[in-house]
């Protein structure tokens, strides 16, 4: 909560003192001089979808840099300028994007296309399953005339919507429609590029569905955060994990470790999973105590700089996941 207040204050200060009146950011300049649209995105999957659709018709910016911790990202003054000067701003719209509304409310967005991708899918509430470390919630109270009552709890939706390939297809199509509207001259290009990319995503989706259908094991155990709610919901998989998807915790309690170890032993699970950019400490501890092998399942939330520079995409990462999913579900 305190971090969000600081972000809000910083945003208001930047806009109030007119920092946005400074020279244009490089991406916006390049886009204008080349006759292209300028697109600003928040995180990697959004950037990748926009890249695939726009092709060479846009200048792209990703605010959260490769290898950065997405859940602790705060927009810098330079980031705010980039958003204000962009033709298109694309974001997820979940808990970690709480800062976006303050920025947009303080800007003239009449000539800008704003795309909130959670509006393109059916979001589900965050959940804590058995054995998982519960997140520490800030206790907020409201005072009435004679007593203090807990404030109504806001519903928090799981923001990792892109982990479902079917959702990813919806997101790609949403972006394509928006780009065609703001840049009708290249509408046919955007439509074709979106069709090509969704076909690639669908191919991966079909392959995963086939693996799951043939698998003797339908349970995934994560010694890590779990950002795959939409993924397991789509494919009908069960899971156990140390932390929810947006948790910033890195150390599990003895109770959580014991629960995950017992789950592996009781179900004869051969592999424990960890996610990208993880220190793998919990997964390694579970592996050492149970003999389970280690496998990565990449949520595509962010990538390393090397992977980014090498041209990693949503599809290429999901194709890597296919092999580790096949291995884990085969349980051999």
Predicted regions, residues:
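Sec-dependent N-terminal signal peptides of Gram-positive bacterial secreted proteins and lipoproteins
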Residues: 3-25
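Extracytoplasmic metal-acquisition and chelation regions
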Residues: 9, 22-332
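Compositionally biased, low-complexity segments enriched in small residues
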Residues: 1-2, 144
């Amino acid at each position: 909560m305190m971090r969000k207040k600081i972000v809000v204050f910083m945003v208001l200060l930047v806009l109030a003192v007119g920092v946005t009146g400074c020279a244009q950011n490089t991406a916006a300049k390049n886009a204008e001089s080349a006759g292209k649209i300028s697109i600003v995105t928040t995180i990697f999957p959004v950037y990748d979808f926009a890249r695939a659709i726009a092709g060479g018709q846009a200048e792209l910016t990703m605010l959260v840099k490769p290898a950065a911790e997405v859940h602790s990202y705060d927009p810098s003054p330079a980031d705010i300028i980039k958003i204000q000067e962009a033709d298109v701003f694309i974001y997820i719209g979940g808990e970690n994007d709480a800062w976006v509304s303050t920025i947009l409310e303080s800007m003239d967005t009449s000539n800008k296309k704003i795309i909130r991708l959670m509006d393109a899918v059916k979001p589900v509430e965050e959940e804590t399953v058995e054995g998982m470390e519960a997140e520490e919630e800030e206790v907020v109270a409201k005072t009435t005339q004679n007593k203090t009552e807990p404030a109504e709890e806001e519903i928090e939706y799981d923001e990792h919507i892109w982990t479902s390939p079917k959702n990813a297809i919806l997101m790609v199509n949403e972006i394509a429609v928006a780009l065609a509207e703001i840049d009708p001259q290249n509408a046919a290009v955007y439509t074709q590029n979106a069709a090509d990319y969704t076909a690639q995503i669908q191919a991966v989706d079909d392959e995963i569905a086939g693996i799951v259908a043939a698998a003797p094991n339908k349970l995934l155990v994560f010694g890590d955060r779990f950002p795959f709610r939409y993924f397991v919901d789509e494919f009908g998989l069960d899971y156990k994990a140390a932390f929810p998807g947006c948790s910033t915790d890195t150390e599990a309690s003895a109770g959580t470790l014991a629960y995950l170890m017992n789950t592996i032993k009781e179900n004869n699970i051969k592999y424990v999973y960890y996610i990208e950019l993880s220190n793998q400490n919990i997964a390694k501890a579970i592996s050492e105590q149970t003999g389970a092998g280690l496998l990565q399942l990449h949520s595509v939330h962010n990538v390393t700089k090397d992977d980014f520079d090498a041209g990693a995409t949503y599809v290429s990462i999901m194709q890597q996941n296919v092999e580790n999913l096949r291995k884990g579900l085969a349980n051999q």
